[in-house]
């Protein structure tokens, strides 16, 4: 059985509800009626009664890497909101996967539209290297593209996350402006304006990546010099 106990915020205060999934019927879940609560927002998942799985199989040591690969970026983007993930009471540390010193966040305005660019530099290569994700203000990923450094050979492993109200209702966006799908009919002049915004956004993203890349390469040179000096001493 799996049970999600969630507390979420509403304009009238926090409410709590549970979602239960029985082993016998994995296609149907039970959702409780929401009830007012004074508890803090968050979700707790409890897994029990699964045949063939012991406590060690769901220990922190077994699940840490899997969870960080999936959620390190989310924890980093929401660090100011104090959002955390814990396994059996132990908190996941996104810094194991993310180089926080090299990662960059920048807020800009394009045509009076706010954009927040977050360049995440990974400590090691991951599956989703060199991708750009476009998120709306609710944190929902609306589109995905690749950066211009997706074939770099300098071990600069990175992803870019851009958050803006601009992406709400605009799925399938690419930085090259080849594909923009809007909800409903879109006038030609509005489409042209979107392309202008994306062109400027692409330049801003490029500048952020290049600045961080230059610092990364300088740091690699310093490390190489230090290693040579250590060998010669």
Please state what every model-predicted region is.
Residues 1, 34-38, 74-77, 107-110, ...:
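A general structural signal for short secondary-structure junctions and capping/turn motifs
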Residues 1-93:
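GHKL-type ATPase core
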Residues 8-10, 51-53, 73, 91-93, ...:
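Short loop/turn segments at secondary-structure transitions that flank enzyme active sites
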Residues 18-25, 91-129:
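A broadly used, surface-exposed interaction patch
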Residues 21-26, 37, 63-68, 104-106, ...:
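Short, low-complexity, polar/charged sequence segments that are solvent-exposed and flexible
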Residues 84-96, 222-233:
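Amphipathic alpha-helical surface "interface" segments used
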Residues 85, 108, 134:
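Short aromatic-centered micro-motifs
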Residues 114-233:
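GHKL/Bergerat-fold ATPase module
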């Amino acid at each position: 059985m799996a049970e999600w106990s969630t507390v979420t915020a509403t304009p009238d205060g926090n409410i709590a509800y549970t979602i239960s999934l029985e082993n016998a019927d994995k296609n149907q879940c039970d959702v409780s009626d929401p009830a007012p609560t004074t508890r803090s927002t968050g979700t707790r998942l409890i897994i029990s009664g699964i045949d063939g799985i012991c406590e060690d199989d769901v220990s922190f040591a077994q699940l840490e890497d899997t969870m960080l690969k999936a959620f390190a970026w989310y924890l980093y983007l929401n660090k100011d909101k104090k959002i955390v993930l814990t396994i059996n009471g132990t908190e996941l540390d996104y810094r194991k996967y993310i180089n926080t010193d090299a990662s960059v966040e920048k807020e800009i305005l394009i045509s009076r539209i706010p954009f927040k660019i977050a360049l995440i530099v990974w400590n090691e290569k991951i599956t989703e290297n060199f991708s750009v994700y476009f998120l709306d203000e609710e944190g929902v990923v609306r589109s995905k593209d690749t950066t211009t450094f997706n074939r770099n050979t300098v071990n600069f492993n990175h992803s870019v996350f851009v958050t803006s109200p601009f992406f709400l209702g605009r799925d399938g966006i690419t930085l090259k402006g080849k594909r923009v799908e809007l909800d409903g009919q879109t006038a030609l002049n509005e489409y042209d304006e979107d392309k202008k915004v994306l062109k400027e956004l692409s330049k801003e993203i490029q500048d952020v990546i290049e600045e961080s890349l230059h610092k990364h390469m300088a740091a690699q040179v310093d490390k190489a010099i230090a290693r040579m000096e250590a060998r010669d001493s």
